[in-house]
């Protein structure tokens, strides 16, 4: 028995020898980098684009449900999972932490071979406080609630409550310390969402005595200095409200920002609260952190219909001034104006990241412009646990098609973001679209499937490797190439008069092209079928 035990110890020591004998270079911490006016998420020191999959809200509270979630992650072909950690379960009693669910989540991501975005469900979830621990919910004196304009208490922690903020920050710091201790070597976790869809649902601001005193006080100097320093570059609605008040550099919230005062006041205090939580977490483990936004829906007439003070387009600048420890602000998309709103979040001071998008066949192809038009960091549909039926099953299939096309292209896309040589196509109500590639070449796109507000859209991207060498990829698009310097021809001759030398199917391994079939004869068309394809198109340009 002693000899067997000794042999086991020898084997163990031998396995540990490299750790003591050789210096092991640790993986660099994930971080955001700004290069030549564009942002990159670096993972293991290399640009990383998120093809994500987010769980339903409750899946990470139960191992069986979590296993079903990772089945969905695999079925989608995602490279990143997104799932919550719940304050109420992490800290069931003040100062007592239970990390078992956190460990199960990280282990599940490792087993699935994907990276992980941790979503911190704590003081806020959809504009309310559902995930605060029971001991916070019971103690309304210490952890003050928002008061509505009629004097009624709401199920929302007041953003001016220091006790709630500090309790949240302590728990979040404990989570980040645990992640550092257990995941620093593997770097499974690459991003952290601080809270979820913050703001005040059902009221434009907190009308409690303390909050009203602050509302009637002067706007903080940090915000007025920010407004002055960014004059001409502010979000239009905020700039207009400030202009109507004479662009004052001091005064109360109402004096400085007029009709936007209540929402801006809420944004300032919510953002300061979230920033304090993020700062505590970063002190423990400095992963990139973001805050996500419940967007303003068509027909919403005032703050409170959406969570007032969350990082919506109206108040992005307030958040930028108030929350320097929050690396980016991210829209959640459950409405069709994806590109219009994405353009407002893709700012010189904010990269686009879409941590939630509807699990609907209609939304899958938006991944192409998110990555290729707006230089986005990634995208993730919400609720990917498979049920095998209905619209959800159809949506999973459509997202899987899009991800199959995009996944081998990610290194190429990451390298070409921000260069002007990466382009996106997305089907809209027009039957044709023209994509101009410099002054010489145009691609005329048409879509075999009719435009449908609920059904799948044709979408794709084009990478200009050279003026006469294109990567064309996507789902459900037909292209005709035109030489803009050649004589005009009858439209009926377009297909046969293309300046195309060759068309190859294929894929990429890293940035190395691996060719498949050469398409010629009856198949010499630049066609991306519904199931998706990657083509290498070489042009004849004298």
Language-model-detected regions and their locations in the chain:
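Conserved, mostly hydrophobic/aromatic
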Residues: 45, 81, 109, 175, ...
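Catalytic-core region of carbohydrate-active enzymes that cleave or remodel glycosidic bonds
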Residues: 114, 276-287, 313-411
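The substrate-binding groove and active-site-proximal loops of carbohydrate-active enzymes
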Residues: 52-62, 84-102, 149-170, 254-271, ...
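Aromatic- and carboxylate-lined catalytic core of secreted/periplasmic carbohydrate-active enzymes
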Residues: 368-486
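N-terminal carbohydrate-binding accessory modules
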Residues: 22-79
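C-terminal beta-sandwich/jelly-roll accessory domains of carbohydrate-active enzymes
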Residues: 445-456, 462, 468-542
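Aromatic-lined substrate-binding rim segments of carbohydrate-active enzymes
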Residues: 65-140, 270-284
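Polysaccharide-binding and catalytic clefts of secreted carbohydrate-active enzymes
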Residues: 142-316
């Amino acid at each position: 028995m002693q000899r067997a035990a000794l042999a086991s110890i020898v084997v163990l020591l031998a396995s540990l020898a490299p750790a003591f004998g050789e210096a092991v270079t640790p993986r660099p911490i994930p971080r955001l980098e700004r290069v030549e006016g564009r942002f990159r998420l670096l993972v293991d020191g290399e640009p990383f684009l998120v093809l994500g999959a987010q769980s339903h809200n409750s899946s990470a509270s139960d191992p069986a449900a979590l296993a079903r979630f990772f089945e969905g992650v695999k079925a989608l072909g995602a490279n990143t999972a997104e799932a919550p950690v719940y304050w109420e379960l992490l800290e069931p009693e003040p100062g007592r932490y239970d990390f078992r669910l956190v460990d199960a989540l990280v282990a599940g991501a490792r087993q699935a071979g994907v990276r992980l975005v941790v979503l911190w469900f704590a003081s806020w979830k959809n504009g309310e406080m559902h995930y605060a621990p029971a001991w916070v919910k019971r103690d309304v004196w210490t952890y003050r609630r928002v008061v509505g304009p009629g004097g009624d208490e709401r199920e929302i922690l007041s953003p001016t409550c220091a006790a709630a903020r500090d309790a949240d920050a302590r728990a979040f710091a404990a989570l980040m310390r645990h992640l550092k201790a257990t995941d620093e070597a593997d770097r499974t976790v690459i991003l952290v969402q601080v809270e979820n869809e913050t703001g005040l649902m059902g009221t434009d601001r907190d009308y409690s005595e303390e909050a009203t005193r602050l509302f009637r006080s002067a706007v903080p100097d940090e915000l007025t200095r920010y407004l002055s320093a960014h004059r001409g570059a502010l979000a239009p609605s905020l700039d207009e409200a400030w202009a109507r008040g004479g662009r004052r550099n001091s005064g109360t919230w109402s004096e400085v920002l007029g009709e936007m005062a209540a929402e801006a006041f809420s944004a300032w205090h919510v953002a300061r609260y979230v920033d304090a939580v993020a700062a505590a977490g970063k002190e423990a483990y400095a992963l990139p952190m973001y805050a996500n936004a419940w967007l303003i829906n068509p027909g919403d007439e005032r703050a409170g219909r959406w969570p007032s003070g969350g990082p919506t387009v109206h108040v992005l600048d307030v958040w930028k001034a108030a929350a320097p420890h929050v690396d980016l602000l991210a829209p959640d998309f459950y409405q069709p104006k994806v590109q219009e709103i994405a353009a407002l979040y893709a700012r010189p001071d904010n990269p686009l990241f879409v941590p939630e998008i509807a699990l609907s066949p209609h939304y899958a192809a938006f991944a192409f412009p998110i990555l290729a038009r707006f230089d986005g960091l990634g995208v993730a549909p919400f609720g990917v646990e498979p049920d095998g039926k209905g619209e959800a099953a159809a949506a999973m299939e459509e997202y899987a098609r899009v991800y199959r096309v995009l996944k081998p292209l990610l290194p190429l896309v990451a390298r070409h973001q921000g260069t002007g040589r990466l382009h996106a196509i997305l089907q809209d109500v027009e039957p044709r679209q023209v994509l101009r590639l410099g002054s010489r070449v145009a691609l005329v796109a048409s879509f075999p499937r009719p435009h449908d507000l609920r059904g799948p859209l044709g979408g794709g991207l084009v990478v200009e490797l050279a003026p006469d060498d294109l990567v064309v990829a996507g789902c459900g698009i037909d292209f005709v190439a035109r030489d803009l310097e050649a004589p005009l021809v009858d439209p009926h001759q377009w297909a046969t008069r293309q300046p195309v030398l060759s068309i190859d199917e294929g894929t990429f391994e890293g940035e190395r092209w691996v060719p498949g079939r050469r398409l010629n004869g009856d198949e010499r068309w630049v066609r991306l079928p519904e199931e998706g394809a990657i083509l290498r198109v070489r042009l004849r340009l004298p």
